[in-house]
Amino acid sequence: LIQLDEGNFGAAMLIRGSKVIGSDLRSSEITPQSAFERFQQNRRRILTGVVTTGVGAFFASRIPGFLEPETTVHAQALPAAPSKYTTSENQTPFAKATHYNNFYEFGTEKDDPAKNAHTLRTRPWTIHVTGMVKKPQTLDIDTLLKYRSIESRIYRHRCVEAWSMVIPWDGYSLSELINLCEPLPSAKYVQFFTLVDRKQMPDLPGGYDWPYTEGLRLDEAMHPLALLTFGCYGQVLPNQNGAPIRVVMPWKYGFKNAKSIVRINFTDKQPRTTWNEINSREYGFYSNVNPHVDHPRWSQAHERRIDSSTFPRTIPTQMFNGYDEVASLYSGMDLKKYY
């Protein structure tokens, strides 16, 4: 089986200088999008021969994104300035990050969202901000896109299922939107609501209390790392990755990152969240990445990193996913109890 390195596509539109703050990854080391697209075409021709063999077909069918169509390579560009939030770790290739997803509204298999999310209509799109705020808002997605400058942040992404990626997300701090709405002193939590529409989500599974909801403490949502996200890899978000607007909390497990948001509500009580309500023993409200607190059914001490390697590597999981700057948010808390 031929191993093909897809490189670090996506960052070329995001990193302009010779070196970004806090990183040893130079722009000269990043594959330009045009080169990536040529590579994908060549890869297809090579793989056409490779996977006709029994061994090639067997392995290729089991590697995330290996033979998936690059349906979003030509998506609308989203210019983003470089930021200090980056990493020298190898990025997950675009094809893998967009074809190995959890988005149950479009199916429960990892490749279902990429197959089914084309039915999602992202224009027009409105976000309602409600609850304990001085200035409730009804905001159009394009208004939000222009509200602040978009920046690129290359974050580690850790799923509760013990796999991980490194993804360049594009957006601005969630605190910018929160400050616009001016929460009341009594507001302590933020709740996010994902779109639910059976016409756009014909594969919406039963057995769940839709819409999908997630929540954060207000101080968590205000942390500079919390990202209101509109794109990835220098493009608008693909539908399967939570278009047109989602949040990214890099120190938490991935299910805390609400996708396709239509409402944000401020409250004084810990809000209902979907997975915590389904099984609070397995999915805590906080769900911070913690290698010392196992999921009841598997260890969280290690993770399978999905990157440009043919097969995922197993690496140790870091506390808070390596984002130690959030530790002060949980000072004095028993993180085995408040998981």
Predicted features along the sequence, with ranges:
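Generic hydrophobic/packing signal
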Residues: 6, 42, 50-51, 98, ...
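Structured, non-membrane catalytic/scaffold regions adjacent to prosthetic-group chemistry
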Residues: 76-339
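C-terminal segment of classical bacterial N-terminal signal peptides
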Residues: 60-65
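Iron-sulfur (Fe-S) cluster-binding modules
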Residues: 17-18, 29, 48, 54, ...
